[in-house]
Amino acid sequence: MYFVHPQIKLKELKKVNLSERLPFYFPGKQIVFTDMGRSAFKIIAENLNLQGSDLLMPAYICDVFTPVLQQYNIRPVFLDIDLKTFHIKKEEIRKKITKKTKAIFICHTYGLPFDVDALRKELQGFQKISIIEDCAHAFGAGVGNKGEAAFFSLYKQFPTVRGGILVCPKDWQVSLPKTSFNLRDFVSFLNYFPAFAFLFKRYGSEIAPKVVRREKMPDPASLNKRSLCLFSRSLGYFEKSLEKRKELALFFQQELKKLGFEVQEDKGNVFCLLSALVPKDLQDKRDEIVKELRKHRIFCIRIWKDPIVLDKERFPNTFEAAKRVINFPLQNHHTKKDVNKMMAALSYILKKK
């Protein structure tokens, strides 16, 4: 069985000292663990005084930020994306800056680092515009240090159930209330084990309605101790196996290209989500392909398949990506044999289309 979300290998859970390890990733920065990544974004919005301002951001992004933007009266100014990177089009940035623009929100989409240095040059000559890095998919990609602030979403890459990291200047005063690991968190934790994950995928909607993972408090809060412990015990194996993951992802991409898929650029990519666009002649059958793969116990996803923008003419690439993207399973413990099994199933399905 193959799943996109992180899976637990018990023998690889070895605790590391986070207070010693994390400064290596974020030198000279303050590191704050939050209940969720969006909690960290709220703290950033407050400390950068974004209330009532314009925020440049990708049109191809999760709708989870919408309530935060509304809460702080921030007007999103959307930019279309490049289909090879899934990043915002740099050529659109200058055209979209307004007198009320205080920040630009960039996303290291699917694990591919966005060139923040090039963005700095692009912003020269404008009033002070802060750069906010959305690193939800990109822990280990060397990102999070070049903007005014950054945030990570731990459970996208680690079996932590929930959790975010705020990376910000040391002079920010951040004090957060504590949270606890509850029953719903425990049920979510079981999803990191393949047998339970399969049962949840197969019967979950019959047992209980799907509930979006939300913050435990209306205001930003800290990460519970059990999730923090899971992160500390997963980080060592993540670091040790990251290069193997990258190598396997490149092999996976080459196999996908043989079937006509268009793959994301790979330079610096940590492949949190190995994502590809189905061939254009099959784009109307993308959802059928995903459903057929489930019969082979290959559980792909299609994140952001429903664009948060409505104007297809202004954001053509965003709509195309939403219609064609498939996010394939890739775990750090997978091998080429696993990839070959998935590709054999995919090839069989495509031949019937």
Named regions from a protein language model:
Residues M1-Q51, Y72, Y237-K240, S347-K353:
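Conserved PLP-binding active-site segment in aminotransferase class I/II-type PLP enzymes
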Residues P6-I8, A221-L242, K246-Q253, V263-L277:
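Conserved glycine-rich beta-strand-loop-beta hairpin in the small C-terminal domain of fold type I
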Residues I44-K99, E292-L293:
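Conserved PLP-anchoring active-site segment centered on the Schiff-base-forming lysine
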Residues K84-S175, Q331:
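Active-site phosphate-binding strand-loop segment of PLP-dependent enzymes
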Residues D171-K225:
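Active-site C-terminal subdomain of aminotransferase-like
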Residues V174, D281-I289, H334-N340:
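Short, conserved charged micro-motifs
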Residues S188-N191, D266-N269, R286-V325, Y348-K351:
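Conserved PLP cofactor-binding pocket of PLP-dependent enzymes
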